[in-house]
Amino acid sequence: MSSVAIVRQMDVVQGMLHKSVIALAIVPTNRSLTVTGRKAYSVMLHLAQMQAAAGTESADGGFAAPLNSILRGFGATNSISSDAKKYIDQMVSTKVEWRPLSKSEQQLPLTFGIDGKEEGGSPAQITDELRIFNLLAEVRVYKRAGENWVTWYYPPSIREELVSPSRWAQVDFAVLRQLTTYCAVALYEICARYRDSPAGVTSRQHWSWWAESLRSSPTSKVRAWRKF
C-alpha cells in the first residue's frame, strides 16, 4: 500500500481534519479573510480528503458537495447561509502567504536546470522561501435537483499536499465550532500541530511572525496582547 493511500485512510475520521502545514500559518495579502471563510475552508478540505480516500473526486480533479453540508460542518447559522457565496468568493480571491512553522517544512528543492541539480552537485534545498497562493483555484456554484451545490478545485502545485498531507495538524471540528474570532481559529490550528510534541511547546518564532499569522487582514492593526 502506498504512503499516499495510508495518509488518506488516516484522514477519514468523522469530525477530524488532518490539515496540511501549508494551510495553517497563512497571512492574507490582498484582502480580509473572515473567520467564517477560514472555517468553511477547513470543512471543504475535510470533504475533499474523504472523497479522495473513497476515490469519488471528479475526473478533472475537482471536489463537490451540497452547500448545506459545508455550512453544517462548522455549525453555520441561517444568517450565514444567506451569505455563503460571499465566503466562497473569499477563498478564490484571497491571496495568502504561507509561513512555514519550521525550517524543516520548506521541503521543495530549488530548480537550476532540467534535472533540478546544480552542476556537479546535489539538489539545493530551499532555506528562505516566499510562497503566495490562492486558497482555491476555481469554484462553481450551481443547483442540482433544486439544491445548491459547490464544486471546487485547489491550485495544482499544492493540491496533493492539501488532500493527502505529509505533515499536518489534527483539527477537531467540535472545538472549531466554538471559536468565534479569526485569531482564535488561527491560533488553535497552529497550536494543534504541536499537540503531541514531547516538549509541549510550539516552534520558536519572532513575535512579529505570530502577530502577522493571527491577523485576518493585511490592513488590520497589530493587536497589543497586553491589552484586552
Residue ranges and their predicted role:
Residues 1-228:
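Charged, alpha-helix-forming regions
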